[in-house]
Amino acid sequence: MEYGLIGAKLGHSYSKIIHEMLCGYHYDLCPLPTEEEARAFLAKRQFKAINVTIPYKKLVMEYCSYIDPRAKAIGAVNTVVNKNGLLYGYNTDYMGFSHLCDAHGVNFAGRTVLILGTGGTHNTTSAVARDKGAAKVLTVSRHPDPEKGELSYAEAVSSGAQIVINTTPAGMYPNVGVCNLDVAAMPDLEAVVDVVYNPDKTELILRAEEAGVPVAVGGLEMLVAQAVYAAEYFLDRKFEDAPVEIRRITAALRRDMLNIALIGMPSSGKTTLGRMLAKSLGRTFVDLDEEIVKTDGRSIPDIFAAEGEDGFRTKETAETQRFGKEGRQLISCGGGIVKKPENLRALHQNGVILFIDRPVDALAVGGGRPLSSSTVSYTHLRAHETDQYLV
């Protein structure tokens, strides 16, 4: 292996895509489930340069002949370059997080900062916050240690913090929908930053947006930025305009990885358009109504007849949440998807929602669709739900 990534679990890593998009060299993902395997790999030194992820960012320091002062202060190395058999260690997570905050206008000067979590990324983000002038940096833990000044999540709400940084895996794929901090009860918040990048918007970020926090941003751009800066170490050269490269690759990744969800009135053409778009874009096509039928074993009219609309909506939400957390799909949604806010949240977390708008007189009536059995039903549905489609 010349270039690559080592870590215990790499199944959902974007690093290969980013590095090969950026530089064109072959980049391997090398999962090393045990410490023994990691030590054996590092001892052999059969690579030009590697990135290191959880849980080996501290362990790798034992094998480095040189460690960058910033990486040494943080206590973690995520980038290693082999120079004639000697390993040089750096921390580009610091640079990536710093870029993310600068790019989105996060102002640390004089602010109180809450960092959720006590793991390795806590030290990185804390260093950035302090270096950028934070007045106070507080640590939040599910099991706080009072002797270390750590806060519980309940105490954090009344801390008066202006900035929240999540460094925990809460809300990360596949366990999406988790949020441990009540940001809606924190009126002084100016920014919420989550280092988690999958899904694109964690539950924490969605709640921050709903609460009107001015800056609410996930970790994808940080991931790309640290990779760009790592590649500079790999190749021993600077990119002409690193911020431009970071924006370009972040945008390309987001276009490629996010879902496209089609919503609109019943019979507005979502399924037909969806199949065409999925084929054109090379995406997996998902029709949520079809998935409900597959899972339940009954037709939609039969489900309505047996369980009513509430029973059907419960099944619809389950399928929306199942597919909404995945990526690279074209999702066609039922006409009533907007009736439950949690459906839109599930679609927003990892996707772009497009509203297919057609006039009522152009829509087909009936066809076994309980909500559109007549023109009167259509007109009533459109009058009452257009605002929800445009949310």
Q: Which residues does each PLM region occupy?
A:
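Phosphate/diphosphate ligand-binding glycine-rich loop within oxidoreductases
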Residues: 2-104, 199, 205-207, 211, ...
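Glycine-rich adenosine-cofactor-binding loop
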Residues: 7, 91, 110-130, 264-266
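NAD(P)-binding Rossmann-fold cofactor-contacting core
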Residues: 134-147
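Rossmann-like adenosine-cofactor binding region
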Residues: 148-216, 337-344
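Adenosine-phosphate binding glycine-rich loop
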Residues: 195-257
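ATP-dependent small-molecule kinase phosphotransfer cores
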Residues: 290-348
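Conserved phosphate-donor/acceptor-positioning beta-strand/loop module used by diverse small-molecule
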Residues: 347-367
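Conserved small/polar residues in nucleotide/adenosyl-binding loops
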Residues: 379-386
